Design a protein with these regions (language model features):
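Extracytoplasmic loops and strand-loop junctions of Gram-negative outer membrane beta-barrel proteins
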Residues: 23-25, 113-117, 159-163
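Outer-membrane beta-barrel "beta-signal"
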Residues: 169-183
Length: 183
């Protein structure tokens, strides 16, 4: 429950900040990285005078890896909601980019039981991630991002102290590519 409040508060700060100031903003599509599969994101600097910014997105996730959840499903698909704070290094059109965030996901998992019947169930989970990459922003508004996104599962516990069966991956390194438009 604490993560949900944190995500909601951070999302409201990013969106409300964008509504009241004129600064560099962008929409971009991301392949892999924090999106896991494919996502659409909004990114904005917190003011005209800072290199600090944030992003919020929605992503479709699809995996046939049995390592995604502790229950080892044969297929996982669903929606995730990455949110992050980032910092741009450098001036002009070429930037190094570092960021830290979390992604919360709602997933549908499928496996076959011992009798061969297909069993489907819903679950949720979250993972923390870093963005370590390069960002190019052209004068015409085109933005390109490439880099690595190390991530680690954030374990959750119920009221009795037992670990929930959320995202179970050990540390992973997802490459990412993003293309979008600055305005």
């Amino acid at each position: 429950m604490g993560w949900n409040k944190f995500l909601a508060t951070l999302a409201m700060l990013i969106v409300s900040n964008a509504a009241f100031a004129e600064r560099e903003q962008s929409f971009f599509m991301e392949l892999f990285g924090a999106s896991t599969s494919l996502g659409i994101h909004y990114d904005s600097r917190f003011s005209d005078y800072t290199r600090w910014g944030g992003r919020i997105g929605i992503a479709y996730t699809y995996s046939r890896s049995q390592d995604f959840f502790e229950s080892a499903p044969e297929r996982t698909r669903g929606w995730s909601f990455p949110i992050a704070v980032n910092y741009l290094i450098g001036n002009g059109r070429h930037h190094g980019e570092i960021g830290i965030g979390i992604s919360y996901g709602l997933y549908s998992c499928m496996y076959h039981d011992k009798a061969g019947r297909e069993v489907e169930y819903d679950t949720s989970g979250s993972f923390g991630f870093l963005d370590l990459g390069y960002r190019y922003q052209s004068e015409r508004g085109i933005m390109v991002r490439v880099g690595l996104c190390p991530g680690v599962a954030l374990k959750s516990y119920d009221e009795s102290g037992l670990r929930n069966k959320g995202v179970n991956r050990a540390a992973v390194f997802y490459p990412y590519v993003g293309v979008g438009y600055n305005f």
